[in-house]
């Protein structure tokens, strides 16, 4: 179910979530993706996360190309790409996320729980996503 809200997080920051993988025709493949496609199941998201296929991004052009309003705080041309391999690496600094905040965009109802669990485990502190945002 798509809602048009902003997401407060316990870390007081917001994150844009999408997958930048494409098929042979250049079409996006969805694990988590902002836009008009329907999302996959919770388990598909979980598997994608463990394969490190999900990207956290505040890239302006991605949202523009998806036909969406610019929901991030990033200025035009400002890009922050973070693969999950970066987030789960030992030397990842949570302050990098805080400097590059945007909005969370997910396509699956249960994705919130999956992301909360993963981020909570990674940062060893409770992360709560109150509600999600998808702007078509």
Where are these regions (language model features)?
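Pre-Walker A adenine-sensing motif
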Residues: 1-28, 42
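Hydrophobic, Leu/Ile/Phe/Ala-enriched alpha-helical segments that form helix-helix packing faces
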Residues: 2, 10, 15, 67-72, ...
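Generic recognition of cysteine residues
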Residues: 16-19, 72, 80, 107
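Conserved P-loop
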Residues: 25-94
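Generic hydrophobic/packing signal
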Residues: 37, 45, 53, 110-112, ...
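Broad hydrophobic/π-residue packing in well-ordered secondary structure
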Residues: 66-67, 103, 136
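Conserved RecA-like ASCE ATPase "motif II neighborhood" in helicase/translocase motors
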Residues: 76-128
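A short, conserved beta-to-alpha structural element at the edge of catalytic cores
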Residues: 128-136
